[in-house]
Amino acid sequence: MKGIRLCGSGAAVPRLRISNDDLSGRVETSDEWIRTRTGIAARRVADESESLTSLAAAAGKQALERAGWDASSVDLILLATSSPDDLFGSAPKVQALIGAGSAVAFDLTAACSGFLFSLVTAAQYLRTGAMTRALVIGADQLSRWVDWDDRRSCVLFGDGAGAVAIEACPAENDGLLGFRLNSDGARGDCLTLAQTSERAELLPGMSHQRGGYAPIGMNGQEVYKFAVREVPAILKQLLADTNTEPASIDWLLLHQANQRILDAAAERLGIAADKVLSNLANYGNTSAGTIPLMLHEAVSDGRIQSGQLIASSGFGAGLSWGAALLRWDGPTS
């Protein structure tokens, strides 16, 4: 079996920045209330000139540039998203915008765990030798599905995209040292973007369901309890699987959902606060975009260096959660 090399990163966010003070003009809230409970100061929201597809393509192009690849060399594009521009899939459109005509492209939906699930999925194609190069993109435009009059949820989410270019390599240079993935549909009702339907007449005496989607629904307390229990647990299992001591981890890269969750997970793992990567203050929760967006930012500013060990975990709706132990081997700063 081959190994996987992480070769380049990219990111894209909308131009429009919505601060906590801006939101306080629409709902009863304040900068202090939001920061204290979430760690978020602002979020980016796509306007009418931007889309999930355009953000994903921009992030993907940058990852290819940083990896030094021509788009024609990519065999696979996986787009992790829960908010596609087209329910039939947005990855093929991203493929066209990038110019990766030789790549098979498809969407993978696993909410805020989506990027990590997609990275692991893409890696399996490369490990077997079926493919050589893959582009994994995490992108969401959840602003389309937020109830902007619900102060419990509208303060949390933003739009954004991140991408990582990976390629097959000799097993001894493997950059995906281990992973674990979990799902539990029995607990899924605490975080939903659920279908709605209404009866519509099709023919006399015959009807069908006309569909749509309700705004994001969330039981914040249950989501918090789920995250602070399962994220440290799955990371501890992964570190045990790979015979890795927490002290040897250079960076903890978690899904950027809430600063309280990041802090609690790090404390339970015994990982120092200065090893916890966070950009929640600037972007909020971009769902499948958070991990690659944070990775790219830390690579670009020189925090993450080639050869460093990264413990990562994604978690969210489904419920779904996973963890991966990564070694960065792409360009930095």
Swiss-Prot record:
Matches recorded under CDD domains: KAS_III
Q: Which GO terms describe its biological process?
A: fatty acid biosynthetic process
Q: State a single Gene Ontology molecular function.
A: 3-oxoacyl-[acyl-carrier-protein] synthase activity
Main EC class the enzyme belongs to: transferase
Q: Where in the cell is it found?
A: Cytoplasm
Keyword set for this entry?
Answer: Acyltransferase, Cytoplasm, Fatty acid biosynthesis, Fatty acid metabolism, Lipid biosynthesis, Lipid metabolism, Multifunctional enzyme, Transferase
> What pathway annotation does it carry?
Lipid metabolism; fatty acid biosynthesis
- Write out the similarity annotation: Belongs to the thiolase-like superfamily. FabH family.
What protein name applies here?
Beta-ketoacyl-[acyl-carrier-protein] synthase III
Cite the HAMAP family for this sequence. Answer: FabH
- Specify the species: Synechococcus sp. (strain RCC307)
**Assembly:** Homodimer.
User: Positions of the region ACP-binding?
Assistant: 256-260
UniProt catalytic activity: malonyl-[ACP] + acetyl-CoA + H(+) = 3-oxobutanoyl-[ACP] + CO2 + CoA
